[in-house]
Structures are given as C-alpha cells and as structure tokens.
Amino acid sequence: MTKKVFDDISRLALKALLYEVSLSPKPGLVDQLDNGAHDDMSFLTFVDSALALAPFFKIYLDIGFYHAKEDPGLIFERLRASGIEAEQAMFSATKGVNTHKGVNFSLALLLGATGMYLADQPQLLDHVTAFTEEDSLAICQLVKPLTAHLLETDFGSLDLKKELTYGEKLFLDYGIKGPRGEASEGYPTIAHKALPFLRKSLRSTDQETAQLQLLVYLMSIVEDGNLIHRGGIKAWRQVKQDMLLLHNSSLSTADLKAALSAYNDKLIQKNLSPGGTADLLVLSLYFAFLENQL
C-alpha cells in the first residue's frame, strides 16, 4: 500500500509541474502559447525537464518516510544529495538549461516533509486524496526543522565573503530571503495565502480560471527574485502593483486572459519573467491535488 500511495503522490508532483507550464497565458513565462521572456527554453523543454525530475519524487518521499525519526539536519542532507542528482538529470534532459532548479529544491523539501508526515499519520496511506487543509499546513510546518540552519548557514557571514551571489546581495541590500526564507518559515505564502485563495476561488469558478486568478494573486504578493534579477527592485514593485490592480478587478475569464496576454507582451519587451511566482504556483497545485481540490 505504501508503494502505491507514494507512486500516486509522486504523480501529483509531476502533474503540478505539467499543469503550471500548461496554464496559459502567463506573463513573461513559458506556456503553451509562447516562450515568454525566454529565448533558451520552450514548452517542450519544460515537459522534458519535468519527466527527468519525476523519478526522484518518490525518492524524496522515501527519504522523509523511512528516516522520519532521524535528526532533521540529516534528513535535509539526504534530500539535498538526491536533489543534486535530480538537478543533474534535469540539466541533461534540457541540454544545460535551468528550467526547474528552484522548484526542485522546494519539491524535495515538501515531498520529504510529506513522507515524514505520512510516517506519523499512517491512516492517510489508505486514501491518497484524503488530505485536509490541516494536513497541508502540517506538512509545510515540517519543513521548518529541516531548514532551520539554512539562513544562518547561507546568510550568516556574508560580510566575510569576497564575492556574493545575486540572492546574497538581495538579502544584504533589501532583506529579501528568497526560496530559503520561504522554506525556513514553513512556506507561509502557500499555507496562509495561496491555498486559502485557491480553495475559495474553486468554490465559485472553474479550475482554469481559478488557476489564472491564483497566478495574478501570487504575482501581486511574491518576493520574486527572478523579476528582481532581471529588472531590479523598481521593476518588481511595478509588476506587483500592476497585478494588484488586476487582482482587484472583476474580469470575466475571457477578459482576464486578454489582460494577461497583453501584459505578457509588456514583460517580454522588458525581458521580465516572474519565475519565483511560477515555482510557488507549482507548489500550490501540488497541495491542491493532495487535497483533491483540483
């Protein structure tokens, strides 16, 4: 039974990756309509990447489940080692293009945490779609001890480093913690914002529209390192402001798609891509599938 459930959950993670890239239109991002602000990747590049990562999803679950009683730091190291192997498989499939490096990091953590949670909640092994809102929140919380050391390890002695990564510069200059911060805090954007928003939207509209609305909402709130890297703080804040206006409008699905398509043209012209938002959309969809919301 455990193997079947883990196979099913692994497929949900793959499904989340495929749903994200398929959702269209997504401003600045690769989708079924165009390549967004990317000239080195396409829809099929993302499909190849997702399929290359898929075999590792069950490995992440196994690590969390079978090592649940170990020190969280050791579990993290196991997940990181397998995550690096997955990353290498991704780069091999995409011929060196970084499609899913960031979200692979997060999926390793959240699938590992899902395995840990199942070790403590064996009744869930009988029904893969029986997860509740409380289960999702608990899984996010389990990431905290896994990543408690990350910020201190990665950002603790930046004043002593001669060369800084872009993420390190963002932290020093603006206090933006990026994916490390989101993980170390138990994915609050997903648990307390994205998932409640998506659940509510799905009660009043169809699945595609709800996902597009979630995309807009996330773009209006996320500290998107990809946007900042490409356009700077000012450009990121402008995108957030524009998306907040769109979020607060009451557009039909057709008008929403038209607005997103027009904004896609704008972001392409400025070479801006909200990749951080895309990653959080994937993770939100993963939990929505676990809860059988989608």
Swiss-Prot record:
GO molecular function, one term: triphosphoribosyl-dephospho-CoA synthase activity
Listed Pfam families: CitG (PF01874)
Keyword terms of this UniProt record: ATP-binding, Nucleotide-binding, Transferase
Keyword Transmembrane helix: no
Keyword Nucleotide-binding among UniProt keywords: yes
Superkingdom assignment: Bacteria
Reaction it catalyzes: 3'-dephospho-CoA + ATP = 2'-(5''-triphospho-alpha-D-ribosyl)-3'-dephospho-CoA + adenine
Cross-referenced HAMAP family: CitG
Family to which the UniProt record says this protein belongs: Belongs to the CitG/MdcB family.
The protein's name in its UniProt record: Probable 2-(5''-triphosphoribosyl)-3'-dephosphocoenzyme-A synthase
Organism (species): Streptococcus equi subsp. equi (strain 4047)
Taxonomic classification: Bacteria, Bacillati, Bacillota, Bacilli, Lactobacillales
